[in-house]
Amino acid sequence: MENRTSDLLNRLSESATIAMARMARELKASGVDVISLSLGEPDFDTPAVLKQAGIDAINANETHYTPVPGTPRIREAISKKFKRDNGLDYAPDQIVVSTGAKQSLANVVLSLVNPGDEVILPAPYWVSYEEIVKVAGGVPVIIPTTIDADYKINPEALEAAINEKTRLVIYSSP
């Protein structure tokens, strides 16, 4: 049997995030003082209270697959947090918990985008977003922004980018 990767994989670019993380690790290992903004990894150890919660969950045999959108308990807690801290009123069944924003975004794009559909990405954007769109067969349409405009989308540029092939606009803000 021939050992080969899929055509889909061969069409994708190397993850710029992973490449930057590798470069940062190599520089750090060579003695360079590096602040890596690549992977979104915290620069602190896991707090003791979270470690203990994990240990307690294992000891309580909470070690099985959870519902895809998250457990009812965590979705309820998030709903309460949004209401209390952010003034946002979301019901638990409107909340989905995932392993990260990229996973959620990939789920949405793969669910809604067909080959040839266009997906608008205001720049700057997280480097993986363009590749996620390509995996679905979509066409990334980049709208540049500028520091002078505080990286805000120009409404005219957005309107000009929208056409009959536009399926999504991905707007990501910290």
Label the model's feature ranges.
Residues 23, 108, 157-161:
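CheY-like receiver
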Residues 99, 108, 122-123, 172-173:
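Glycine-rich, N-terminal phosphate-binding loop of Rossmann-like dinucleotide-binding domains
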Residues 141, 147-174:
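Active-site phosphate-binding strand-loop segment of PLP-dependent enzymes
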